[in-house]
UniProtKB/Swiss-Prot annotation:
It holds the Pfam family PMSR. It comes from the Bacteria. Its EC number is 1.8.4.11. It comes from Malacoplasma penetrans (strain HF-2). Transmembrane segments: none annotated. SUPFAM superfamilies: Peptide methionine sulfoxide reductase (SSF55068). Belongs to the MsrA Met sulfoxide reductase family. This is Peptide methionine sulfoxide reductase MsrA. The keyword Oxidoreductase applies. It catalyses: L-methionyl-[protein] + [thioredoxin]-disulfide + H2O = L-methionyl-(S)-S-oxide-[protein] + [thioredoxin]-dithiol; [thioredoxin]-disulfide + L-methionine + H2O = L-methionine (S)-S-oxide + [thioredoxin]-dithiol.
Amino acid sequence: MIKKIYLAGGCFWGIEQYYNLNQKIISTNVGYLNSKIDNPTYKDVCNNITDAVEAVELTYDDQVISLNEIIDLLFKVIDPTSINKQGNDIGRQYRTGIYSRDSNELMAIQEKINELQNNYSKLIQTEVMLVDNYYLAEEYHQKYLEKNPNGYCHINLKAK
């Protein structure tokens, strides 16, 4: 079945490109998730007036790749114990999270996070929440690292 999941882990450019490099993923786009204001802009998000998180909407076929595999991949490139920071990206918009529009799916995600907690001495800070809203980011953010291969990325994509 074709499904969508929303992931956050620092700057959305890197997370999007990381999953775009995976042949099992159908498509991605980047946006602002769970904003307190309608139609936020990048400037709004950076000025801390939205409480939105930079996120990637990931479309996948659960017969090809499981949600648990997607979460395992995310945890390979984030520090889930860090609060509002990934690499050089600092701010609430850079928090880590896994978001769904399905409350039953949230329970499965939380179970997976509880299992992964055994691998960490510090508490996992990754949010697990329902999607309240999701606004596409500006076009120049979409597939940014494909358009700008030498652009900034907090993930070492060459090592992946």
